[in-house]
Amino acid sequence: MIKIDVFIKDKNWKKHISNPAKYLKDKVKFINSSTLFNKKYINFSILLAGNKEIKMLNNKFRKKNKTTNILSFPFYKRNEIKKKIKNEDRIYLGDIILNFYKIKKKARKNEFEKEFNKLWIHGLLHLLGYQHDTNKDFYKMRKLENRIFKQTEKTEC
């Protein structure tokens, strides 16, 4: 089972997705049947923010005084997460912060949800220890992102 906690800091999110919490909870349902979690109780949170909030967090935790599209804060170190998923029944993965304005800017007309889905999936994979530091890691992560994205696109929210 996957539990996702959604917090909305910027009101503009609801202009594009009327109920973001329900939307995300509906989207993650399919992951229960995947082999990523092997029937574990998984929890993570998403903060739907704007430029101001994400810039402040980026500066505070990464010492980068600029806005960004996404921040991921894994609860476990990269080399610990796979062991935790294998051995623990309940796991808190961490936090994802998404920037409405960066997503809106990158999304083409009527493709806000598509861009939003790509980004939260990307963040979730970071919480699971996936990185894109090398070409090999990049392609491995991208392949999994695309597979999950295709599954979420089939769901109706």
Predicted feature locations:
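An acidic/histidine-cluster motif and surrounding catalytic segment
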Residues: M1-N117, L127-C157
